[in-house]
Amino acid sequence: MIDRGSEVRILREESYWFNEVGTVATVDQSGIRYPAVVRFEKVNYSGTNTNNFALSELVEVSSPKKKDK
């Protein structure tokens, strides 16, 4: 299950970050086409380090780390 804090690999071939790993910042539950906002370490040509992706374009590499309370 892709959730906030998950490390994901990008499968969208036309993306600058294709096959790169990023961290999910948020996942929108309202039913929009590209609900997952993914943040990356490196920036693209326009200086952006975030992008929206569909859940079908992402593969979870590692799940979010649980906080100890």
Swiss-Prot record:
It comes from the Eukaryota. It is found in: Plastid, Chloroplast thylakoid membrane. One of its GO terms (cellular component) is photosystem I reaction center. It holds the Pfam family PSI_PsaE. GO terms for biological process: photosynthesis. Disulfide bonds: none annotated. The keyword Cell division does not apply. It is a peripheral membrane protein. Its main location: plastid. The keyword Chloroplast applies. InterPro entries: Elect_transpt_acc-like_dom_sf, PSI_PsaE. Keywords: Chloroplast, Membrane, Photosynthesis, Photosystem I, Plastid, Thylakoid. NCBIfam families: PRK02749.1 (NF002745). Belongs to the PsaE family. Stabilizes the interaction between PsaC and the PSI core, assists the docking of the ferredoxin to PSI and interacts with ferredoxin-NADP oxidoreductase. This is Photosystem I reaction center subunit IV. It comes from Phaeodactylum tricornutum (strain CCAP 1055/1).
